[in-house]
């Protein structure tokens, strides 16, 4: 079923890792972990496991950038099978919200990317119709999508010779989300011309031309979407829905009645509580929505009524991509130390935002049920899971029936040497090291604790003739990737930043990583973070890490010991097999789907830092500090280090304010 194509055979630790993981799957192990160091070929190992067990697979990545990279790698490994891409279809997303302290209602505002919509629909079709499928997805895959049973029931089967007339086909197309138009370049549309219907699905590039003779299908052809030339003649075809959420007239009527019932119950509650403003607001808004649903079959924010359309009970999980798979599909959670905390936090973040909308009469309580899955629901809807990371979290390690190590790199590259140097004169020392790197035609990364330090250090390096840029949270995904492209091309010599783990992209030109203030204990200098940062130089033969510190913290000690352990294993392997290490060679263009990444994927799994700062107006200083501290640790656990740093700075500022007021 799966046919893996590669010029390489598994080497190093890959063969034993593949064997153990496949054996674990065949023995029915529910949870396994692949602990693979940077550059050890974890994606190739995953591809081999998929090919060996011949089962559909879902690979979940923590962000769009990494998902795009994985998608391309799997496409190359499986050119004859279906590899699909399923991420949030928003280029820009501002969720609906209400801020009581300002009496400010924010309407939902979003730009939808048609290319991603097409890829999502292609994913749903592939997963429902074949088994040789690998889907690469972001954490958006646990958000609601349409009922898979409706997707199956409402497709249109046509064959040459079928008795159906043009208008009946047009009516059936409209029922599954296609719109009639003359613009043939639009996906999800169809056009009528005499006895011919041309259909442009959202799930494929080719159009479909159906020609009639009276009330009989005379011919079916695939056509080029733009010049409309014939590509292939077909005897039969299945036309799948154009949109994720589809409904029947019967379901619509049932949903409207159910919404009315819930509205009456909620209005009764608000009346008893004496909430007259909320009563009138909810009544007016919901009745307007009902009128639109009855006349147009649609209303703004229709997703907030999804429970009524699906016939779900309050609290029941929504349908998601997971429900489209066969029951035996495998899940790989890539960069699990980041992705698992995201999956855990998304439900709470969504519910906290909707709480005000429901309490203040903007939405019915059923809006809570248009939501992502809880982590427990996610585990119930999945079967066997393989966590993949260079630094798995405690959860993954504790729950896994086996942890498979992949330490040896096929390239022979060893983990970099780690030096600890004093902070006195650290900037001058750093400059000298960067100059050496520059002379070799290589690059450097410098990680610091604050955005301000990153900015000042980058400016200082530039003044000294070193081409430097800094990464910061105001840059969106494309701008961040552009900075890294410049680094790889040699347009800049060094990149300075607070969180250099965010992209997770391969940077083989980087031979030096400098960690400033390495002994300042906290989330930015934890064992996991330090190991991840050290791994940034693991693709270059001259890789070196310098930690500037005046003492060795426990986190530093453990990170250095683990790095040295991995070095020993690789060096012994190289000696035994006569391998000479070589740097990774990778095409200069960092292949990322830029058309998908105009804006950063909305980080919908928690409150934004900005909204947290708004709480200062309604909380006492002590309560506000407690919230800041809690959110800081949550952001750190999810490796959102820039958010965590901003919250930390605000926490320090409030503490200083309190001290001044108390005269301390």
From Swiss-Prot:
Domain of life: Bacteria
Compartment list: Cytoplasm
Residue positions binding ATP: 36-43
The Helicase C-terminal domain, residue ranges: 429-588
SUPFAM superfamilies, per database record: C-terminal UvrC-binding domain of UvrB, P-loop containing nucleoside triphosphate hydrolases
Primary location recorded for the protein, binned into one broad class: cytoplasm
Any Pfam family hit: Helicase_C
Annotated Gene Ontology cellular component terms: cytoplasm; excinuclease repair complex
Motif window: Beta-hairpin: 89-112
Domain Helicase ATP-binding residue range list: 23-180
Biological-process GO terms, alphabetical: nucleotide-excision repair; SOS response
InterPro entries attached to this UniProt entry: Helicase/UvrB_N, Helicase_ATP-bd, Helicase_C-like, P-loop_NTPase, UVR_dom, UVR_dom_sf, UvrB, UvrB_inter
GO molecular function terms listed in the Swiss-Prot or TrEMBL record: ATP binding; ATP hydrolysis activity; DNA binding; excinuclease ABC activity; helicase activity
Domain text: The beta-hairpin motif is involved in DNA binding.
Function per UniProt: The UvrABC repair system catalyzes the recognition and processing of DNA lesions. A damage recognition complex composed of 2 UvrA and 2 UvrB subunits scans DNA for abnormalities. Upon binding of the UvrA(2)B(2) complex to a putative damaged site, the DNA wraps around one UvrB monomer. DNA wrap is dependent on ATP binding by UvrB and probably causes local melting of the DNA helix, facilitating insertion of UvrB beta-hairpin between the DNA strands. Then UvrB probes one DNA strand for the presence of a lesion.
NCBIfam families: PRK05298.1 (NF003673), uvrb (TIGR00631)
Name of protein: UvrABC system protein B
Species annotation: Thermotoga petrophila (strain ATCC BAA-488 / DSM 13995 / JCM 10881 / RKU-1)
């Amino acid at each position: 079923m799966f046919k893996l194509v590669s010029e390489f055979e598994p080497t190093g630790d890959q063969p034993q890792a593949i064997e153990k993981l496949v054996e674990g799957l065949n023995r029915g192990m529910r949870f396994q972990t692949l602990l693979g160091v940077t550059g050890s070929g974890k994606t190739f190992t995953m591809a081999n496991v998929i090919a060996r067990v011949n089962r559909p697979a879902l690979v979940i990545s923590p962000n769009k950038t990494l998902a795009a990279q994985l998608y391309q790698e799997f496409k190359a490994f499986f050119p004859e099978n279906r590899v699909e891409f399923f991420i949030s279809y928003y280029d820009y997303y501002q969720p609906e919200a209400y801020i009581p302290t300002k009496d400010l209602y924010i309407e939902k505002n979003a730009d939808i990317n048609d290319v991603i919509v097409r890829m999502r629909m292609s994913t749903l079709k592939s997963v429902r119709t074949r088994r040789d499928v690998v889907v690469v997805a972001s954490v958006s895959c646990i958000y609601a999508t349409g009922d898979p049973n409706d997707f199956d029931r409402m497709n249109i089967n046509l064959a040459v010779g079928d008795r159906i007339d043009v208008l009946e086909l047009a009516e059936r197309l409209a029922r599954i989300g296609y719109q009639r138009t003359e613009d043939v370049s639009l996906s999800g549309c169809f056009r009528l011309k005499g006895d011919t219907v041309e259909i442009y699905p959202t799930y494929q590039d080719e159009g479909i031309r159906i020609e009639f003779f009276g009330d009989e299908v005379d011919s079916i052809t695939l056509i080029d979407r733009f010049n409309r030339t014939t590509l292939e003649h077909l005897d039969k075809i299945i036309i799948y829905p154009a949109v994720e959420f589809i409904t029947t007239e019967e379901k619509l009527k049932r949903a409207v009645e159910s919404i009315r019932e819930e509205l009456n119950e909620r209005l009764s509650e608000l009346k008893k509580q004496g909430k007259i403003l909320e009563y009138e607001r909810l009544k007016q808004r919901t009745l307007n929505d009902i009128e639109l649903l009855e006349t147009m079959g649609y209303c703004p924010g229709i997703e907030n009524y999804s429970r009524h359309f699906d016939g779900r009970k309050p609290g029941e999980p929504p349908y998601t991509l997971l429900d489209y798979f066969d029951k035996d599909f495998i899940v790989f959670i890539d960069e699990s130390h980041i992705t698992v905390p995201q999956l855990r936090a998304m439900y709470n973040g969504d519910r906290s935002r909707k709480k005000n909308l429901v309490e203040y009469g903007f939405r019915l309580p059923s809006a809570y049920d248009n939501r992502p899955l809880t982590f427990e629901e996610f585990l119930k809807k999945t079967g066997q899971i393989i966590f993949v990371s260079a630094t798995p979290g405690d959860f993954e390690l504790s729950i896994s029936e086996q942890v498979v190590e992949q330490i040896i790199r096929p390239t022979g590259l060893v983990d970099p040497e780690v030096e600890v140097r004093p902070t006195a004169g650290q900037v001058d020392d750093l400059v000298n090291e960067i100059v050496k790197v520059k002379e070799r035609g290589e690059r450097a990364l410098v990680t610091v604790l604050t955005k301000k330090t990153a900015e000042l250090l980058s400016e200082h390096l530039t003044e000294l003739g070193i081409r430097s840029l800094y990464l910061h949270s105001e840059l969106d995904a494309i701008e961040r990737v552009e900075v890294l492209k410049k680094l790889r091309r040699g347009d800049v010599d060094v990149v300075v930043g607070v969180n250099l783990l965010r992209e997770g992209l391969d940077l083989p030109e980087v031979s030096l990583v400098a960690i400033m203030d390495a002994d300042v204990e906290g989330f930015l200098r934890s064992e996991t973070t330090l190991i991840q940062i050290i791994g940034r130089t693991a693709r270059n033969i001259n890789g070196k890490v310098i930690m500037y510190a005046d003492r060795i913290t426990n986190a530093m000690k453990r990170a250095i010991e683990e790095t040295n352990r991995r070095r020993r294993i690789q060096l012994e392997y190289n000696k035994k097999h006569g391998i000479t290490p070589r740097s990774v060679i990778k095409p200069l263009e960092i292949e990322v789907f830029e058309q998908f990444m105009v804006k950063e994927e909305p980080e919908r799994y928690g409150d934004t830092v900005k909204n947290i700062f708004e709480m200062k107006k309604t909380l006492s200083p002590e309560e506000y500090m407690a919230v800041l501290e809690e959110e800081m640790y949550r952001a750190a656990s999810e490796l959102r280090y820039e958010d965590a740093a901003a919250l930390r700075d605000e926490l320090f500022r409030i503490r200083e304010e309190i001290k001044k007021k108390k005269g301390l």
